[in-house]
Amino acid sequence: MNSAYHPPDMSQRIPGPAYSSSAPPPIHTYQQHQHPPPPLPPPSQHHHSSHPPLPPPPSAPHPHHQHPPPPPSHSLSSHQHHGQPPHHQPQPYAPAPYQQSQPSQYPRPHPHQQHVPPPSQHDEPPPPPSSGPSPTDHQKDSEYVPPSYSKIEEGSGWKYSLDVKQQPVRARMCGFGDKDRRPITPPPCVRLVIINTETGKEVDYNTLDHAMFVLSVDLWNHDEPGTPSYQQQSLPPSRESGYGQSQGMNYGQDYPPPVQQSYGPAPSYPPSSSYGPPQQYYPRHSGYSAEPSAPPPGAPFRNGYGQDQNALTRMAVVGGQPQGMFTRNLIGSLAASAFRLEDTEGQSGIWFVLQDLSVRTEGTFRLRFSFVNVGRPGGQGTNVNQGRAPILSSCYSESFHVYSAKKFPGVCESTPLSKKFANQGIKIPIRKDANIKGEGDEEMYDQN
């Protein structure tokens, strides 16, 4: 019984002397631990013998918890030099009561676990990439040019491609009236290139029959590849519109909206996921219901309107009847015939000139040109193809801007190519020299 009481007494004596300055004091204390008989030699405590030297050094418990490794190294080394291995075994008996509070505290302050700054370094890299690529992405969008498309014609083995020699630059919006139409300047001029796949050279354009060559054009947004240009309209949020879907779009409303919203450019072509050969699309008017209906499950929506995957059509409803008509954003001569013309270098070729194109709304757009041969393959005769005529080539123009009447800087000067074609009989508006006529800054045109 007396031997059982001695261990707590000895533990109280240990923190009293300060042996941090010299090694002998700890040896004296360990000799005192030998006097009490070791009636309890459990092996479990013997494993803790490596850790008990840690508690004696701290005079203040809290500051020394963070530095457990140094004391054990000095204490163990001192014991080994003095050659007292037996004193090293009875150590767990004295600090046993002190260990009851320590085991839970030792695993926490391990210095290796306190090095948390490395994760902070991983947090720093994410901000730079998020801020860095944003300007580069804008530059890529501005420099991006949609790819062109070309196809080899079956039967003839000719490969057709389009080359936009004269790009559109700017235009003035003409609104939704037809009285004040302003064409795109300069007029786009597209050259048709035909290569014989057998020889790898261009064909002789002087002997080629181009009467059945047709070029169509449509308007596309410059920053949204794969979507046609159209103007979105939305009703006030207080109005509840019905939904319905079939081949086109059905709308039903409890009360009619204002007539002003019935006018506006609507899409004329279905959107596609990527640039490719265009397909002509004619919107179909579907039924209209006066009672609102719920949208079908899984149907996508945009601005509160149901949207079909194959077509984008919108129509305002007044009293359950269609009030407005579909309106193109691009108006004018949307198809052009081919001409055999000479360029400024005197080389003959097949050209398409689109001098009568106007845009209703302001913005930045692109033109897409699509070439079709409606005649027999290979130019065999002038018979019209009674079946389907595939699109043999398509390309996109550079982006151009359409200004409002107040912001419009003026039409572009007539280019040498436009003047060259005008001299050959193509009706292109040519801007006359104002100084000769004495009209000042007034713009004058000569319709050839």
From Swiss-Prot:
Key words of the record: Cytoplasm, Nucleus, Sporulation, Transcription, Transcription regulation
Biased composition (Pro residues): 35-44, 52-61, 116-132
Phenotype on disruption: Suppresses aerial hyphal growth,reduced colony surface hydrophobicity on solid media, and increases the ratio of macroconidia to microconidia. Reduces the production of fumonisins.
Keyword Manganese: no
Region (Disordered): 1-153, 224-306
A GO term from the CC aspect: nucleus
Record's signal peptide: none
Primary location group: nucleus
Velvet domain mapped to chain residues: 155-431
Subcellular location: Nucleus; Cytoplasm
BP GO terms, sorted: sporulation resulting in formation of a cellular spore
InterPro entries: Velvet, Velvet_dom, Velvet_dom_sf
Gene3D superfamilies on file: Velvet domain
Composition skew (Low complexity), residue ranges: 15-34, 96-107, 260-292
Oligomer and partners: Component of the heterotrimeric velvet complex composed of LAE1, VE1 and VELB; VE1 acting as a bridging protein between LAE1 and VEL2. Interacts with VE1. Forms a heterodimeric complex with VOS1; the formation of the VELB-VOS1 complex is light-dependent.
Entry function: Component of the velvet transcription factor complex that controls sexual/asexual developmental ratio in response to light, promoting sexual development in the darkness while stimulating asexual sporulation under illumination. The velvet complex acts as a global regulator for secondary metabolite gene expression. Component of the VELB-VOS1 heterodimeric complex that plays a dual role in activating genes associated with spore maturation and repressing certain development-associated genes.
Protein family according to the UniProt entry: Belongs to the velvet family. VelB subfamily.
UniProt name for this protein: Velvet complex subunit 2
Organism: Gibberella moniliformis (strain M3125 / FGSC 7600) (Maize ear and stalk rot fungus)
Lineage: Eukaryota, Fungi, Dikarya, Ascomycota, Pezizomycotina
Gene: VELB
